[in-house]
Swiss-Prot record:
Quaternary structure, from the entry: Regulatory subunit of the sodium/potassium-transporting ATPase which is composed of a catalytic alpha subunit, a non-catalytic beta subunit and an additional regulatory subunit. The regulatory subunit, a member of the FXYD protein family, modulates the enzymatic activity in a tissue- and isoform-specific way by changing affinities of the Na+/K+-ATPase toward Na(+), K(+) or ATP.
PANTHER family named among the record's database cross-references: FXYD DOMAIN-CONTAINING ION TRANSPORT REGULATOR 6-RELATED, SODIUM/POTASSIUM-TRANSPORTING ATPASE SUBUNIT GAMMA
Record's protein name: FXYD domain-containing ion transport regulator 6
Transmembrane segments: 35-57
Subcellular localization, as worded in the UniProt entry: Cell membrane
GO biological process: positive regulation of sodium ion export across plasma membrane; potassium ion transport; sodium ion transport
Family: Belongs to the FXYD family.
Length: 94
């Protein structure tokens, strides 16, 4: 009986040590939010700076020239097409 008590008393620190080691292991769902926030802000600043540099450099241009149109210009074109189609005589099909 005494040997069983001695063995149990020797195993108790081992069991407690293994429980303490499990607590010390890193939780896979733990995130370092401070580092994540700083990394995101740095990434946003870099993208913002690249966008401003592209706008200011004026190297990003269209390959063809476009004339600026007035806001009602498209409506006038549609009305002209309608009136020209109505003015043309209908061809009779045989």
């Amino acid at each position: 009986m005494e040997t069983v008590l001695i063995l149990c008393s020797l195993l108790a620190p081992v069991v407690l040590a293994s429980a303490a080691e499990k607590e010390k292991e890193k939780d896979p769902f733990y995130y370092d939010y401070q580092t994540l926030r700083i990394g995101g802000l740095v990434f946003a600043v870099v993208l913002f700076s690249v966008g401003i540099l592209l706008i200011l450099s004026r190297r990003c241009k269209c390959s063809f020239n476009q004339k600026p149109r007035a806001p009602g210009d498209e409506e006038a074109q549609v009305e002209n097409l309608i009136t020209t189609n109505a003015a043309e005589p209908q061809k009779a099909e045989n």
